[in-house]
Regions:
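Non-catalytic connector elements of ABC transporters
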Residues: 40-42, 50-159
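Internal alpha/beta loop-helix hairpins
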Residues: 1-61
């Protein structure tokens, strides 16, 4: 992604998105482009409310996302969240997009730990936690914690 100011992504011989590398990665227009450019967690969801600045997804996860789109209540969307945008902790912090999870898998890489965590409803999230000094001890297999992410970091896809 450092070789060009604009990149084109093709799917089955069709050009599906042309944009700057940062835009392709941070705000892909489709789940294909999002998945093509690296690890990402997807959540199939139904819009519970939308006010042109945010979308709330109901159900067991109750996720809030920033969005410029005016999506009708009840419409199906796919939410996408990059692993580096998700924070894992042992405790609640009282913010939006705070979901209880259990650690299913982890891989310590030295500079970071890659986690695969699961909600009570079975939704999986992949995240990468940077190593830093913290009062929170790292979570291990089978332990319960909370994922946290900002609404601005949730990508809303209509495909």
């Amino acid at each position: 992604m450092t070789l060009a100011g604009r990149i084109g992504i093709m799917d089955a011989g069709q050009l599906v998105q042309v944009d700057a590398p940062r835009s392709l990665y941070e705000r892909p227009k489709s789940s294909f482009v999002a998945d093509f450019l690296g690890t990402i967690s997807f959540v199939d969801a139904i819009v519970a409310s939308c006010d042109k600045t945010s979308i709330t997804i109901g159900g067991d996860l109750n996720i809030c996302a920033a969005s410029d789109d005016d999506l009708p209540v009840g419409s199906a969307v796919k939410l996408a969240i990059r692993p580096e945008k998700i924070y894992l902790s042992r405790t609640k912090n009282g913010g939006v997009n705070e979901i209880e999870v259990v650690v299913e898998d982890l891989a310590y890489l030295g500079f970071a730990t890659n986690y695969r965590v699961k909600t009570a409803s079975g939704q999986m999230f992949k995240l990468q936690q940077q190593q830093r000094r913290s009062l929170d001890a790292p979570l291990s297999w089978g332990e319960t914690g909370y994922v946290h992410f900002d609404p601005q970091d949730v990508i809303v896809l209509k495909d």
